[in-house]
Amino acid sequence: MFSDRFEQLVQALRILPSVGPKSAQRMALHLLMKNREGAFGLAHALHEASSHIHECKICHSLTENEICDICLSNDRDQHLLCVVESPADVMAIEQSGSFRGKYHVLGGHLSPLDGIGPEEIGIPYLIQRLSSGEIEEVILATNATVEGQATAHYLLEATKHLPVHMTRIAQGVPQGGELEYVDSHTLSQAVHNRMKMK
């Protein structure tokens, strides 16, 4: 319609979740017509973040360093590990102020129909991490979706041979809901009222 560069911008914006062609077009027009300075700021911030933020070598959350501050902290409970699907879940739990242990980010959930098995979300690495003997309790805080529940169940079965106490965050997180959209109070209650699984 306008130019190849405009279409490239629209297509680039469509990689964002829940952004369809119309939304991407509206965003592109807004950036170019009403907020060109904001567009340059956005491009710079995106470049900086993409260049300097990567996965923590231990927990797989996001960090600017090789190892994130949470993994490096001696003030956190070294024996308590919370397993989540994404860095957004770490942010949500941290904002609730209800957890003082360490994290492990799977980077997704099991979905055999989509070709996502245990290897694709790093479950062997998690089991290796649990085998070190330092972790005493694991809180499974995968989403309350069918896939999240299946992932939690798989982890429970895969760790039966380990001397680790497995718990699941209490329901209170809506069925079918994702942690990053749950309010802090509900999430805090869910962490405090976690259930024994093993």
Curated annotation (Swiss-Prot):
Q: Which NCBIfam families is this protein grouped with?
A: recR
The domain of life is Bacteria
Which protein family is it in?
A: Belongs to the RecR family.
Keyword check for Cytoplasm: no
Q: What does this protein do?
A: May play a role in DNA repair. It seems to be involved in an RecBC-independent recombinational process of DNA repair. It may act with RecF and RecO.
Q: Where are the zinc fingers (C4-type)?
A: 56-71
**Any idea which UniProt keywords this protein has?**
DNA damage, DNA recombination, DNA repair, Metal-binding, Zinc, Zinc-finger
Name under which the protein is recorded: Recombination protein RecR
Q: Toprim domain location, by residue?
A: 79-174
Q: Which PANTHER family did the record assign?
A: RECOMBINATION PROTEIN RECR (PTHR30446:SF0)
**Gene (name only):** recR
What GO molecular function terms would the record report?
Answer: DNA binding; zinc ion binding
